[in-house]
């Protein structure tokens, strides 16, 4: 695509046609900033790129929509992206402190309570996090380093809406 505006239009059009193929359509928008200009890329663009890079390593098969500029832009490899994200399952051991460090390193912001994608909160043995690949945040309860429960919750009421056996946390940048 020529730019991010046409990229979004192509994504909407192609999304209609790829829905019946069983393949996901991933989007890798360009930064649209000159690396030497000193200006930072838009945060939403960074989030969308990080999510697509994460999903490329998680789901198969898929289509990838990108611009020529995105194609030539250097990016981190699949192992580095996987290291920034996390897959969490009940009864697995994960150090809550290590998860908090990983969240901060991958672009999440600590807020209490969380209200938006890309935020996390820690209270005792409870970690709330809202990953960009989910529609609602999850609450992960630990007993020591062992994951005791994973629940989807409503950010407005803070009430649990669904129990999960596992969840993934995609990087934000």
Regions found by a protein language model. Give the residues of each.
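ASCE RecA-like P-loop NTPase motor cores
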Residues: 1-173
């Amino acid at each position: 695509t020529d730019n991010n505006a046409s990229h979004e239009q192509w994504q909407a059009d192609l999304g209609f046609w790829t829905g019946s193929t069983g393949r996901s359509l991933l989007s890798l928008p360009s930064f649209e900033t000159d690396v030497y200009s000193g200006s930072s890329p838009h945060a939403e663009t960074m989030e969308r790129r990080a999510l697509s890079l994460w999903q490329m390593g998680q789901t198969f098969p898929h289509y990838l929509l990108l611009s020529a500029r995105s194609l030539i832009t250097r990016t981190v490899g699949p192992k580095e992206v996987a290291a920034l994200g996390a897959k969490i399952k009940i009864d697995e051991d994960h150090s809550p402190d290590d998860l908090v460090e990983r969240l901060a390193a991958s672009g999440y912001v600590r807020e209490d309570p969380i209200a938006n994608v890309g935020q996390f909160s820690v209270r005792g043995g409870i970690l709330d996090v809202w990953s960009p690949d989910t529609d609602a945040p999850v609450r992960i309860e630990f007993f020591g380093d062992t994951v005791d429960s994973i629940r989807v919750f409503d950010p407005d009421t803070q009430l649990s809406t669904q129990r999960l056996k596992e969840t993934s946390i995609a990087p934000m940048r």
